[in-house]
A protein has these predicted regions:
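Positively charged, small/polar-rich N-terminal and surface patches that mediate targeting and assembly
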Residues: 1-104
């Protein structure tokens, strides 16, 4: 049995946006689960000046490929240019994999 699952990391500007994006992904049965970490401070440079934003982090668990998740994120994400990265996993416990496959 393949004990791998894909994990993607992205951010949203508000808990409301995060909830909407999570529901869209779950409704499409594209993901197993999404963890939302609220109230993260992000610092960055935009248009030549320093910015600070409060964001939520989304950790997305799925069996789908980056291309499929990327298309779904682009379609539903509130940002014009969302950040999305795939985190490599080595081995996930088999009980979780069985549960995840049964529920997606």
């Amino acid at each position: 049995m393949n004990l791998r699952i894909n994990i993607f990391y992205t951010t949203c500007g508000s808990p409301k946006q995060s909830k909407k994006l999570a529901k869209a992904m779950l409704s499409d049965k594209m993901i197993v689960c999404v963890n939302v970490v609220k109230n993260v401070e992000s610092y960055y440079r935009d248009s030549g000046s320093l910015k600070k934003s409060n964001e939520s982090i989304l950790l997305i668990k799925t069996f789908h490929t980056k291309k499929k998740i990327e298309n779904l994120i682009k379609k539903n994400h509130p940002y014009d240019i969302p950040f999305l990265v795939q985190l490599e996993t080595k081995k996930v416990n088999s009980e979780y994999i069985l549960w995840a496959r049964k529920n997606t």
